[in-house]
Amino acid sequence: MLFQLNIVFKELKNPDFFFFFFFFSLPLSSFKLNLSSSSSFKLWLIVFLLDFGEIMFPAPPLPIANFSGALLPLSLFLGFLDVDLIAAKALPLEVTTNRLSSFALIVSSSSILPPRISSSSFPPLLATFFLLKKMFPAPPLPTTIGALLFGDEVVACKD
């Protein structure tokens, strides 16, 4: 029996949590992917480095007005996602600069999960990840973290 993954986000402000959870849980869950521990770690490491790179060097948001029209073909392209979008009974969804308006995204595994993910599946996975990261750019780092990472001067607040 396939592992059922049902995630509901309302007022999604930081979709990085979803992508981290989904990609990280793929090799560790009961999905019948037949991934070896080596390839599982490589997949997780690639996604982690991509996400860290997006935080360090964020890409500008893409002007996408129809979220459902963009995501559903991607799910069909990947071939193993069953995606339903609910947005206050109104589609298409309006995408603002750094966030989406109120909506719920329900992702569940379907019966068309492939029995195995081979190395040929990595390019579409990575391409989809990049596109989704551009659609939902990560929020900017807090000033103190940015100062620690980039060596800017940190001004301490006095009590």
From Swiss-Prot:
UniProt keyword Zinc-finger, yes or no: no
Originating species: Saccharomyces cerevisiae (strain ATCC 204508 / S288c)
Segments passing through the bilayer: 17-37, 44-64, 67-87
Other facts noted in the record for this chain: Partially overlaps YDL173W.
The entry's keywords: Membrane, Transmembrane, Transmembrane helix
Protein's recorded name: Putative uncharacterized protein YDL172C
Membrane topology annotation: Multi-pass membrane protein
UniProt keyword annotation of Ligase present: no
Places the protein is found: Membrane
Coiled-coil zones: none
